[in-house]
Amino acid sequence: MTSLPSNDAPYRLIDGVDFGVDVIVGPFTNLYGCSVGDETRIGPFVEIQRDVLIGARCKIQSHSFICSGVELGDEVFVGHGTLFINDKFPAATTDGGELKTDADWELVPTVVERRASLGSGVIVLGGVRIGEGALVGAGAVVTRDVAPGEIVAGVPARVHARP
C-alpha cells in the first residue's frame, strides 16, 4: 500500500486504500479499503467503498458513489453524480425484522470494462457488466449488461447505437 496522494485536499476520510502513483484525490472524499490505479483522478464529494478496484488513468467526477464489489477497468470515465448499486434486493431489515448488518447483504459484483464512459447522473444496478468502450448517456439507469462499444441511454437504458 502506498501513502496518501501528495495533493493536500481538506476533509478527506481515507482508510486502508492502495494507491498507485500520481493519483489525485479531491476534497471531501471518503475512500476506504479500495484499490486505485496509477494516474487516476477522483473529484470532490466522492465515496468509494471497500473491495472496489479502480484501474489506471480513470476519471471519477464529483458527487459519485461507488459501492463495494465494483471493478472499473483502465481509462474509465465516471460522470458527476453517478451511483452504483450492489444489492439486488435492498432492505433495511431482515425477514425477522432485525436491522441488517454487512453480513446480511447479498452483494452482486459489477464490472465496467476498459475505456467505457458513464455520463452524469447514471445509475448502475448490481450485477451489470458494461463492455469495453461502451457509452452510457447522462441520467440512464443501467439494468442489464451493455455490450462493448454500444451506446445506451434512457430509463431503463436502451441501445441507441452499436459498433
Which ranges hold each PLM region?
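Flexible, glycine/small-residue-enriched loop-and-beta-strand segment within the central core
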Residues: T2-D15, V25-G127, V155-P156, H160-P163
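Short, basic/aromatic beta-hairpin or loop at an interaction surface
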Residues: F19
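C-terminal/domain-terminus segments
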Residues: G127-D145, I151
